[in-house]
Amino acid sequence: MFRSTWNFLKRHKKKCIFLGTVLGGVYILGKYGQKKIREIQEREAAEYIAQARRQYHFESNQRTCNMTVLSMLPTLREALMQQLNSESLTALLKTRPSNKLEIWEDLKIISFTRSIVAVYSTCMLVVLLRVQLNIIGGYIYLDNAAVGKNGTTVLAPPDVQQQYLSSIQHLLGDGLTELITVIKQAVQKILGSVSLKHSLSLLDLEQKLKEIRDLVEQHKSSSWINNDGSKSLLCHYMMPDEETPLAVQACGLSPRDVTTIKLLNETRDMLESPDFSTVLNTCLSRGFSRLLDNMAEFFRPTEQDLQHGNSINSLSSVSLPLAKIIPIINGQIHSVCSETPSHFVQDLLMMEQVKDFAANVYEAFSTPQQLEK
């Protein structure tokens, strides 16, 4: 039997060699295919885990953003109430001074200015912190992902994070003071000549706020000018110009300072982007809409209006003398800058445009390939 098998193999030698080669190739290809499939599965699993880890870190970062905004609102409110102290004027009016009319005029300007600045600065705080914390969050994610790898340099050490995030103080300090000046001038121009006895409906009030916004957002600034000569919307209130104390030092910059300047420049690039401008404008529109909603409660028709059959759905059906509107607008700062989640702040924090923008910023700074560009 062995001899017959051997003779068969000798007679079909070439065929057997070919068959053996084919079977061997199939076996090798099968092993290679299994190895590649296993590698692909392992890579996909690693990518899925990395993506899940990054998504978890992103969501945690957004919660941090929200808590940071809420924690900073009392500081913002205190700064506004200190620089625009309407309470002292109100107390003065109770003493029945001889210049009562003059004090009322001052109270009119300060009350409107305070609430309008509160809307602007709160919207700026929400969007600016979204940018800053997602930039630094992206760096922290990359640092955490690189833990244990040889030759890796920490991108954002804690001291750099602290130095970078302290730049928010510009919005709460010099930026806020400049914003107050600009808005106060706009309020004076639009409402300065309006009599305290003049009645305004909610629709009239909306138009006045629009006129004030137009003046504020067209205000010229020596810095933050785009290449085409147009002004970047409101950016200089959120960050100082590029001549920062760190940047102007001729020598002696530490590695920490260099990294911080890099982060600030990246933030400045984000603030100058069309996406940032769009998101901020959307927040401002929502903010002023919510401000009017809050005030609408005081423009409800009276029993007499209802008896006369006046339309209760019209924004112009109820009017109030400006003197009665002043205390209403004056008190809005406590709703706008409330550290307890109010409808005003919640609306801003939960806006889809803000969430999408935050995701894009985080994506850009948590991806090594994007960061190297």
From Swiss-Prot:
It comes from the Eukaryota. Residues 1-15, 141-373 are cytoplasmic. The chain crosses the membrane at residues 16-36, 117-140. It is found in: Peroxisome membrane. InterPro entries: Peroxin-3 (IPR006966). Residues 120-136 are annotated as: Interaction with PEX19. GO terms for biological process: protein import into peroxisome membrane. Residues 1-45 are annotated as: Targeting to peroxisomes. Pfam families: Peroxin-3. GO terms for cellular component: peroxisomal membrane. Residues 37-116 are peroxisomal. GO terms for molecular function: protein-macromolecule adaptor activity. Keywords: Membrane, Peroxisome, Peroxisome biogenesis, Transmembrane, Transmembrane helix. The keyword Transmembrane applies. The keyword Transmembrane helix applies. It is a multi-pass membrane protein. Interacts with PEX19. Belongs to the peroxin-3 family. Involved in peroxisome biosynthesis and integrity. Assembles membrane vesicles before the matrix proteins are translocated. As a docking factor for PEX19, is necessary for the import of peroxisomal membrane proteins in the peroxisomes. This is Peroxisomal biogenesis factor 3. It comes from Bos taurus. The lineage of its organism: Eukaryota, Metazoa, Chordata, Craniata, Vertebrata. The gene is PEX3.
